[in-house]
Amino acid sequence: MRLFLSLPVLVVVLSIVLEGPAPAQGTPDVSSALDKLKEFGNTLEDKARELISRIKQSELSAKMREWFSETFQKVKEKLKIDS
């Protein structure tokens, strides 16, 4: 009885496997994949440049740069006096 049930299942499985992938499941074209990758890279580059320019122009970063400059000058002056 088991053989009687397993043979049709085996035939169906083999027919599905030997049929190959469906057109929608076929391997994508390499050039389209590279185009998508290039588009993603360009988008990422644009967003990164925009973020960097926002950071450079923000008030917080200007205050931080000023604070670091002042602190660095104070440290330099202390080191000159001590030496």
Swiss-Prot record:
Keyword terms: Lipid transport, Secreted, Signal, Transport, VLDL
Keyword Metal-binding found: no
Any one of the GO CC terms: extracellular region
Domain of life from the UniProt record: Eukaryota
GO MF annotation, one: fatty acid binding
Effect of residue 71 to S: More susceptible to N-terminal truncation and shows greater distribution to the VLDL than the protein with T-71
Leader sequence residues: 1-26
Subcellular location: Secreted
GO biological process, one term: negative regulation of fatty acid biosynthetic process
Record flagged with keyword Transport: yes
Extra remark beyond the main annotation: Apolipoprotein C-I is present in acidic (APOC1A) and basic (APOC1B) forms in P.paniscus, P.abelii and P.troglodytes and perhaps also in baboons and macaques. The two genes for ApoC-I arose through a duplication process that occurred after the divergence of New World monkeys from the human lineage. In human, the acidic form has become a pseudogene sometime between the divergence of bonobos and chimpanzees from the human lineage and the appearance of the Denisovans. Pseudogenization resulted when the codon for the penultimate amino acid in the signal sequence was changed to a stop codon.
Biological role: Inhibitor of lipoprotein binding to the low density lipoprotein (LDL) receptor, LDL receptor-related protein, and very low density lipoprotein (VLDL) receptor. Associates with high density lipoproteins (HDL) and the triacylglycerol-rich lipoproteins in the plasma and makes up about 10% of the protein of the VLDL and 2% of that of HDL. Appears to interfere directly with fatty acid uptake and is also the major plasma inhibitor of cholesteryl ester transfer protein (CETP). Binds free fatty acids and reduces their intracellular esterification.
Protein name: Apolipoprotein C-I
Source organism: Homo sapiens
Record gene name: APOC1
